[in-house]
Amino acid sequence: MDPQTQNTSLQRLQNVENRVVKVLELAGGVMEELASPSGPKKEFVNSHCREFMQSMKDIQVTLREEIKSACEYRPFEKCDYNARIANEICFQKLEYVLTQLEDLKQTADRYPSSD
């Protein structure tokens, strides 16, 4: 991988890291809203959950592209173990987050709308 490509790749991964932080802030905002003494505002929770889900999908796509591009520059043709393992770990983590988010959505849907 030439230095220019590597630098660009690192910048894209830095952007992903920033998006992950934003996603965690969204999740924290939803948790605070759910804990609100006056009850959660359904529209607030729904919009933040939608944004969370879209961001997670975007992050997953970006990470897959980065893993694929890293594999294209690998020195040994069949040496993709690290990339495959990293991809599998990320995939499992995203599945877990999506499951938790679905549970959160179901919980939020049980509360009456306070609009």
UniProtKB/Swiss-Prot annotation:
Q: Where in the cell is it found?
A: Nucleus
Keyword Magnesium included in the entry's annotation: no
Entry GO MF terms = transcription coregulator activity
For biological process, the GO terms are: regulation of transcription by RNA polymerase II
**Keywords for the protein's UniProt record, in alphabetical order:** Nucleus, Transcription, Transcription regulation
Q: Which cysteines are joined by disulfide bonds?
A: none
A cellular component term, taken from the record's GO annotations: mediator complex
Determine the domain of life of the protein's source.
Eukaryota
Biological role stated in the UniProt entry: Component of the Mediator complex, a coactivator involved in the regulated transcription of nearly all RNA polymerase II-dependent genes. Mediator functions as a bridge to convey information from gene-specific regulatory proteins to the basal RNA polymerase II transcription machinery. The Mediator complex, having a compact conformation in its free form, is recruited to promoters by direct interactions with regulatory proteins and serves for the assembly of a functional pre-initiation complex with RNA polymerase II and the general transcription factors.
Q: Which family does it belong to?
A: Belongs to the Mediator complex subunit 11 family.
**Which proteins does it associate with, and in what oligomeric form?**
Component of the Mediator complex.
**This chain belongs to which protein, by name?**
Mediator of RNA polymerase II transcription subunit 11
